[in-house]
């Protein structure tokens, strides 16, 4: 190659190499700058991720409602998430009742070396894992212990600014707002998600009610206590129905200080499980008012609805059995959990069940104020098909039922013309209140002619089921038994016969078979099918057709508690009683 050409070629190559080096340098510089910016963003601007372990949905829901910072992300974690603890900027642990094994405890301890961790209320000293300094721990603990929207809001701001060290959208947290120990509380009508308003006297509370249009002279009044439900949801439901609600924060002080004597309470509703105590039982005896115990399923509503068991033994005992020692009634699911916009579980009042519960309480209150002569009572008794007798362990059912009717008459109830004796009542039950097997066509024909059954039309049944049953249950009945009225207890003109004996304002009804088939024992003790039309119709006729004020199951247990999805807490799903 000619020397001049070689020189020009080498010069060109040198220029290219310089350009490449410059590009490489600029690229490296860009990487360094971008890396620095990313690091700076992560350190000063990025999202603060806070994990909560072993937190109750009620508390976590309150913390979630307090978070208005888009740069703070809250997450609920379980032991299944322990492999990803390093993904968070702060871990807060509720140590009360925390159950972790040695390996899980080691994982949490190791994570605390990298991630600031605070455990509070640890019942096991080994679980008291804290890696923030004493000053920060003390400040955060004060926010947690005092609770409320303001304190939780400040706690989250404190974590972002001082624990996570962020500069962007990191406001100065407010000082701890010490929570006063109020006697009564009420949600703020102007800010329902905010902190509850507190009152230390009936006079203060009544003034608040009057100012907000909630004081109603002569209205039914309830005392609402306990902390396992969404209190504002229940308060609003009762107030919408015309009740005056006294939300009691310190029940024992409220009673011992005779504040309760200043109001004419018609009922007490306790949202907590377990016992209230002997002092409260004495109070209830003096006032002669009922105690209601709405249930919180403490899990997602969707999970509960698909679970045939519904509640396990221990939780059922605390929520249903133990409150009954105090005389609690109506253990009915009102509260469940749902996923909120932050992806966290929160407690809420299930709307249709809340409405049903409030209606039931109102029914009890109205019943007490109603004259005995006007009260309407439906009494369901259990007997086998055909000539089988009414049964109950250790009880002569028909004589006992007759004695009840006589007692009702003596108490001023309208029972019309009663039979002369228990034997006559037994004959009437066999003729008018029998339970028929699907095989007893001849006896059923005779019953239609002389048994004086109530007849339910397709239009009535459709209206009643839409009020009382879930769409799922209606669909299952239609699929299993065809179009109304089906084949069992049906008339030729498309009506459904309901066996009953009516004595004035008291009606006796047999609890008909809860399924179809020849094995009556199995049907009584639980089938995995929707109950037939006639089973549902007898209860809905008592409720809507007869307009019963009260319903009594008389004698041995029947099949209601074994019908599909009715384990104590699901009767509204089954829809056959109220």
Residue ranges of predicted features:
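An N-terminal assembly and electron-transfer interface module characteristic of large anaerobic redox
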Residues: 2-578
């Amino acid at each position: 190659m000619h020397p001049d050409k070689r020189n020009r070629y080498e010069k060109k190559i040198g220029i290219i190499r310089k350009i490449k080096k410059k590009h490489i340098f600029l690229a490296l510089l860009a990487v360094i700058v971008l890396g620095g910016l990313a690091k700076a963003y992560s350190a000063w601007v990025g999202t603060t991720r806070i994990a909560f372990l072993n937190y109750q949905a009620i508390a976590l829901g309150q913390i979630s409602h307090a978070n208005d910072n888009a740069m703070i992300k809250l997450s609920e974690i379980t032991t299944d998430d322990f492999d990803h603890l390093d993904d968070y900027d702060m871990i807060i642990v509720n140590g009360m009742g925390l159950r972790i094994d040695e390996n899980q405890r080691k994982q949490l301890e190791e994570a605390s070396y990298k991630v600031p961790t605070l455990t509070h209320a640890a019942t096991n000293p080994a679980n008291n894992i804290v890696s923030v300094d004493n000053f920060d721990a003390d400040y955060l603990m004060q926010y947690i212990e005092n609770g409320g929207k303001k304190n939780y809001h400040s706690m989250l701001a404190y974590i972002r600014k001082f624990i996570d060290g962020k500069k962007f959208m990191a406001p100065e947290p407010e000082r701890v707002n010490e929570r006063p120990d109020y006697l009564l509380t009420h949600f703020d009508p102007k800010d329902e998600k905010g902190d509850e308003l507190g009152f230390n006297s009936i006079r203060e509370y009544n003034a608040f009610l009057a100012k907000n249009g909630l004081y109603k002279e002569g209205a039914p009044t309830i005392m609402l206590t306990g902390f396992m439900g969404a209190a504002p949801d229940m308060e609003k439901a009762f107030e919408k129905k015309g009740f005056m609600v006294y939300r009691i924060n310190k029940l024992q002080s409220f009673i011992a200080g005779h504040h309760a004597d200043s109001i004419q309470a018609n009922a007490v509703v306790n949202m907590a499980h377990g016992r209230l105590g002997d002092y409260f039982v004495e109070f209830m005896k003096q006032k002669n008012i009922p105690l209601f115990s709405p249930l919180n399923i403490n899990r997602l509503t969707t999970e509960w609805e698909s679970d045939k068991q519904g509640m396990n033994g221990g939780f059922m005992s605390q929520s249903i059995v133990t409150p009954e020692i105090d005389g609690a009634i109506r253990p009915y699911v009102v509260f469940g959990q749902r996923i909120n916009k932050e992806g966290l579980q929160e407690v809420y009042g299930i709307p249709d069940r809340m409405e049903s519960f409030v209606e039931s309480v109102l029914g009890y209150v109205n019943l007490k104020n109603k004259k005995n002569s006007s009260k309407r009572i439906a009494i369901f008794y259990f007997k086998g098909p055909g000539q089988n007798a009414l049964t109950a362990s250790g009880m002569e059912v028909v004589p006992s039922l007759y004695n009840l009717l006589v007692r009702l008459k003596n108490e001023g109830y309208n029972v019309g013309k009663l039979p002369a004796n228990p034997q006559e009542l037994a004959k009437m039950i066999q003729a008018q209140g029998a339970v028929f097997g699907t095989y007893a066509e001849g006896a059923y024909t005779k019953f239609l002619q002389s048994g004086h059954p109530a007849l339910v039309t397709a239009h009535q049944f459709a209206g009643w089921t839409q009020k009382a049953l879930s769409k799922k249950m209606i669909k299952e009945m239609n699929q299993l038994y065809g179009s109304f009225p089906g084949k069992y207890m049906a008339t030729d003109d498309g009506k459904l016969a309901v066996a009953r004996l009516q004595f004035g304002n008291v009606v006796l009804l047999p609890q008909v078979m809860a399924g179809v088939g020849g094995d009556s024992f199995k049907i009584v003790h639980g089938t995995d099918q929707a109950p037939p039309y006639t089973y549902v119709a007898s209860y809905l006729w008592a409720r809507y057709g007869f307009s019963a004020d009260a319903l009594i199951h008389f004698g041995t247990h029947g099949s209601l508690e074994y019908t599909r999805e009715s384990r104590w807490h699901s009767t509204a799903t089954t829809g056959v009683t109220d």
